[in-house]
Curated annotation (Swiss-Prot):
Gene3D superfamilies, per the entry: P-loop containing nucleotide triphosphate hydrolases, Translation factors
Name by which UniProt lists this protein: Elongation factor Tu
Organism: Corynebacterium aurimucosum (strain ATCC 700975 / DSM 44827 / CIP 107346 / CN-1) (Corynebacterium nigricans)
Family (UniProt): Belongs to the TRAFAC class translation factor GTPase superfamily. Classic translation factor GTPase family. EF-Tu/EF-1A subfamily.
Classification lineage: Bacteria, Bacillati, Actinomycetota, Actinomycetes, Mycobacteriales
Region (G3): 83-86
Length: 396
């Protein structure tokens, strides 16, 4: 069967759910797709809760690990939705997922209010550059007391203001579960939530005029057709049958031709900044490419190992280190979709860096990463995020 073509008729926005484990992020995602599928059946399909929550690992522990993409449309826009991981161990994935959001829905259970991971996700959203947040106050059907809801709202607004988000951001009272069950009042609450997304997240400005760049998130083989790399196009555009170069991580770059482009299982003639898509590569073996490399217009960007960065070191309460670190500290640096070990050099006269500090540092990575000034990264050790920063100067 020939694949249908993806139609670009509306502005395309990448959105996601973030927030504390068990506050209902995945249920909210499922409710949005169901309510929109019922309201606008010609342009939406409902995604069941267990289709979204589909990583095998998380079934055992009831936590979302992988990042699931679903799509839906309002009358005004087409949305690609990332269900971001909710568990502390998997903040690594939060970093790879959230870097792709034009806005985020922060899901907070009215029964609990903001929890430690709520705070951590908002901090991370700020550090990885999610520009707008609005709030789905979930499980409102379980709280009768208006005063409790008002207190929770105040706490949420304080939390948003702490990270320089709009403290006047919309807070929409929902019950994702009741909406899934078809309760009219709560179905309307999800429609209101999407109206708030349409109104409060501006149409993103895509970096269309720059040369093509797409970080590789995943790689798989289609029997008889070849290797497909998937990711979100960060810059520029690409047509079918154009050549690309794949750079970073490995010692030498590789050139190939893109023989097909797919988005949401539909074939496309071209792809542009903001799209989540798959590129079919001519004559490329799966083992020749890896996550963390980037596909680029040949010669447009170069990989580097040495840079200067401006870094915020997380406090203990934010999930960071309990103790300071010294010169020559060797953590992992997460760029876009991958982590690379690097050695930190502190500025002259700085003996150590305390949790909570802002610091300028130079870094030498053990593998090259395609980067330029302004690129954001997170610093991790083991499962813990210990800092977040951006590249201020390329050294080599």
């Amino acid at each position: 069967m020939a694949k249908e073509k993806f139609e670009r008729t509306k502005p395309h926005v990448n959105i996601g759910t973030i927030g504390h484990v068990d506050h209902g992020k995945t249920t909210t995602t499922a409710a949005i797709t169901k309510v929109l599928a019922d309201a606008y059946p010609e342009e939406n399909t409902a995604f069941a809760f267990d289709m979204i929550d589909k990583a095998p690992e998380e079934k055992e522990r009831g936590i979302t690990i992988n990042i699931s993409h679903v799509e839906y449309s309002t009358p005004k826009r087409h949305y690609a939705h990332v269900d971001a991981p909710g568990h502390a161990d998997y903040i690594k994935n939060m970093i790879t997922g959230a870097a792709q959001m034009d806005g985020a829905i922060l899901v907070v259970a009215a029964t609990d209010g903001p929890m430690p991971q709520t705070r951590e996700h908002v901090l991370l959203a700020r550090q990885v550059g999610v520009p707008y947040i609005l709030v789905a106050l979930n499980k409102c059907d379980m709280v009768d007391d208006e005063e409790i809801i008002e207190l929770v709202e105040m706490e949420i607004r304080e939390l948003l203001a702490e990270q320089d988000y709009d403290e006047e951001a919309p807070i929409v009272h929902i019950s994702a579960l009741k909406a899934l069950e078809g309760d009219e009042k709560w179905v309307q609450s999800v429609i209101d939530l999407m109206q708030a997304c349409d109104d409060s997240i501006p149409d993103p400005e895509r970096e269309l005029d720059k040369p093509f760049l797409m970080p590789i998130e995943d790689i798989f083989t289609i029997t008889g057709r070849g290797t497909v790399v998937t990711g979100r196009v960060e810059r520029g555009s690409l047509n079918v049958n154009e050549d690309i170069e794949i750079i970073g991580i490995k010692d030498k770059s590789m050139s190939t031709t893109v023989t097909g482009i797919e988005m949401f299982r539909k074939m496309m003639d071209y792809t542009e900044a903001g799209d989540n898509c798959g590129l079919l590569l001519r004559g490329t073996k799966r083992e020749e490419v890896e996550r963390g490399q980037v596909c680029i217009k040949p010669g447009a960007y170069t990989p580097h190992t040495k840079f200067e960065g401006s870094v915020y070191v997380l406090k203990k309460e934010e999930g960071g280190r309990h103790t300071p670190f010294m010169d020559n500290y060797r953590p992992q640096f997460y760029f876009r979709t991958t982590d690379v070990t690097g050695v930190i050099k502190l500025p002259e006269g700085t003996e150590m860096v305390m949790p909570g500090d802002n610091v300028e540092m130079s870094v030498e990575l053990i593998q090259p990463v395609a980067m330029d000034e302004g690129l954001r990264f997170a610093i991790r050790e083991g499962s813990r995020t210990v800092g977040a920063g951006r590249v201020t100067k390329i050294l080599d």
